[in-house]
């Protein structure tokens, strides 16, 4: 144990303040889903511990993140993909009369709607989702002029800081500035330094690199005070040249990507991975709607895959990840999460009616889930590759068999392992304006589930769940449902779940139902349940579950589901434990 010689009350205060900050530091928080299984809509399973191996403490993942939507929110949103399906002749005609005026084009609609990035409900969702993914750092786009979008990054810091207090391992933050040592870049750096860093605001969220807060910017014309405060890594704007100065980092490249900042041992600090690139073989840098642009389904190996649903698979994304995983790099920087906005110009790079950065579902580069289309496929693809890059903790083994009395006292659950932890604080309600003409409300957050366990003996399997506050009445609709994937096979049941408890509100006993196919259920039996305060337990006879001698299944809790039969509801409404498509695994050893 370390000892400290505190010489003054001021010194004691500094130590206490440092300790408080440290409590919520990313390194001391746990990624609750790091060991959990999930299967995406395409049937792709997340890699397990026996595939990716132990967690590597020297590997990091950064993600490009956009904070400037609020500045455009007075405009109505226009879905470019949907618009061009109705007006294909407007594709290269800037003055086509069908193009609406006073709008902001989106390549498609985000899952959470046309939100403004000061919407705290959305920011909390991002905090959880990126924590679950294992993202270490998000980097804000401040590459246009000297605008740094302070209201949005401060709103995010406030929400992420609150999420940390609830145990959520949110990413750290950093800024990407303009690609050059310009007056605008100098001004932007000064703004974030004076407004955020110098006063020490949200210090626990700063991403540190080589002992200092990281900033992706050019240091050439920066005042000494600021220059000495940050680790500077100037951004290389070009996609195909690699580093042109020793301290260059990339933000997006075409395949095969270069390593940036070579270390003494031959490894590299950084490499980029992108979902798509506004680039063509013929002309290099081009708008996303240029013929031959490298969309989501383009690969260097096979060119453009023109199958209708090719965008679902992230072929471009995976080719870049496969390359990065073969290299020895410290940090993979992924572009990107949530740009969404598709700027339209009369000409750009000699292209008429140009969409430089985002265009449509195929020619876009966001990973954040969308409504319809590829939904959350890219999100789970990101998680899968982060696991391959960083490894993962070994899953905790189940404790010995134990009989639970079902007496409503719950003391017998104390030493049952594993103890599955779920995000706390995520039942907040939403009431916020989006882009012009949109307003979003969501009041479905109800029972905030924070912990789950399973026990078993020769006759029964027991399930336990705990909430942050007192449970609501079991007569509430869609109350505390338990989904069980008994064979760990997504092809059976509904989204892999073969059984459900509490799809119908329980009475004296709970109803156990089996899927006949999809969201069609047939009652199997009535089973015992108890709940008191913030704890609930359910007992199911093994015979009803058609279990083999050795247990090996997955399960999930859901409260206040709104759209029966739609698994995407798990990302939007009520609360689930664990989040999204993740499940808790339970296996006898």
Model-identified regions with their sequence ranges:
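N-terminal module-boundary/linker segments of secreted carbohydrate-active enzymes
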Residues: 26-73, 204-206, 222-227, 231, ...
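The substrate-binding groove and active-site-proximal loops of carbohydrate-active enzymes
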Residues: 34-40, 104-119, 135-147, 172-183, ...
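N-terminal carbohydrate-binding/catalytic regions of secreted carbohydrate-active enzymes
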Residues: 47-158, 335-336, 340-367
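Aromatic-lined glycan-binding groove of carbohydrate-active enzymes
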Residues: 54-73, 213-316, 320-333
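Loop/turn elements at helix/coil->beta-strand transitions in domains of secreted/extracellular proteins
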Residues: 56-62, 133-138, 166-173, 202-204, ...
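Aromatic-rich peripheral "rim/lid" segments of glycoside hydrolase catalytic domains that contact
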Residues: 163, 346-410
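Acidic/polar low-complexity flexible segments
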Residues: 396-407, 483-507, 542-589
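Short, well-ordered beta-strand segments enriched in hydrophobic/aromatic residues
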Residues: 408, 459-469, 535-542
């Amino acid at each position: 144990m370390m000892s400290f010689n505190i010489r003054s009350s001021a010194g004691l205060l500094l130590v206490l303040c440092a300790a408080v900050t440290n409590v919520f530091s990313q390194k001391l928080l746990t990624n609750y889903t790091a060991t959990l299984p999930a299967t995406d809509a395409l049937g792709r399973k997340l890699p397990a511990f026996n595939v990716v191996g132990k967690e590597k403490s020297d590997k990091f993942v950064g993600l490009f993140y956009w904070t400037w939507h609020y500045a455009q929110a007075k405009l109505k949103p226009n879905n470019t993909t949907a618009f061009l399906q109705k007006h294909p002749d407007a594709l290269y005609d800037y003055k086509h009369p069908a193009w609406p005026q006073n709008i902001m084009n989106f390549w498609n609609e985000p899952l959470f709607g046309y939100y403004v990035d000061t919407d705290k409900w959305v920011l909390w969702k991002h905090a959880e989702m990126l924590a679950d993914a294992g993202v270490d750092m998000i980097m804000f786009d401040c590459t246009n002029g000297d605008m740094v979008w302070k209201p949005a990054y401060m709103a995010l810091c406030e929400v992420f800081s609150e999420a940390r207090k609830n145990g959520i391992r949110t990413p750290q933050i950093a800024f990407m500035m303009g690609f050059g040592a310009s007056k605008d870049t100098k001004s932007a750096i000064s703004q974030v330094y004076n407004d955020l860093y110098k006063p020490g605001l949200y210090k626990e969220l700063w991403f540190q690199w080589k002992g200092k807060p990281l900033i992706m910017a050019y240091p050439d014309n920066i005042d000494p005070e600021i220059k000495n405060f940050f680790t500077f890594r100037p951004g290389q704007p070009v996609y195909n040249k690699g580093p042109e100065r020793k301290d260059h980092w990339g933000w997006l490249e075409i395949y095969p990507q270069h390593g940036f900042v070579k270390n003494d041992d031959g490894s590299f600090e950084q490499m980029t991975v992108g979902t798509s690139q506004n680039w063509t073989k013929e002309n290099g840098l081009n708008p996303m709607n240029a013929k031959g642009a490298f969309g989501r389904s383009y690969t260097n190996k096979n060119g453009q895959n023109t199958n209708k649903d090719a965008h679902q698979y992230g072929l471009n994304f995976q080719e870049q990840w496969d390359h990065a995983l073969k290299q020895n790099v410290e940090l993979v920087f992924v572009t990107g999460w949530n740009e969404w906005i598709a700027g339209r110009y009369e000409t750009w790079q000699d292209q008429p009616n140009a969409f430089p950065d985002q265009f449509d579902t195929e020619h876009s580069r966001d990973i954040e889930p969308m409504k319809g289309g590829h939904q959350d496929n890219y999100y789970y693809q990101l998680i899968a590759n982060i696991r391959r890059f960083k490894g993962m903790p070994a899953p905790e083994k189940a404790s010995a068999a134990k009989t639970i009395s079902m007496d409503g006292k719950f003391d017998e659950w104390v030493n049952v392992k594993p103890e599955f932890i779920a995000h706390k604080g995520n039942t907040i309600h939403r009431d916020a304006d989006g882009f012009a003409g949109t307003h979003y409300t969501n009041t479905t957050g109800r029972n905030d589930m924070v912990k789950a366990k399973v026990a078993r003996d020769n006759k029964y399997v027991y399930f336990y769940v705990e909430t942050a506050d007192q449970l609501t009445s079991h007569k509430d609709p869609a109350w505390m449902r338990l989904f069980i994937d008994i064979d760990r096979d997504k092809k059976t049941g509904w989204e892999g779940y073969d059984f459900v408890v509490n799809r119908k509100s329980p009475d004296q006993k709970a109803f156990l139902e089996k899927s006949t196919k999809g969201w069609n259920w047939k009652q199997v039996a009535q089973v015992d349940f108890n709940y008191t305060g913030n704890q609930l337990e359910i007992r199911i006879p093994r015979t009803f579950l058609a279990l083999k001698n050795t247990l090996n299944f997955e399960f999930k809790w859901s409260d206040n589901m709104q759209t029966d039969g739609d698994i995407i509801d798990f990302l939007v409404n009520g609360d689930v434990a664990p989040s999204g498509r993740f499940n808790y695994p339970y296996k006898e050893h």
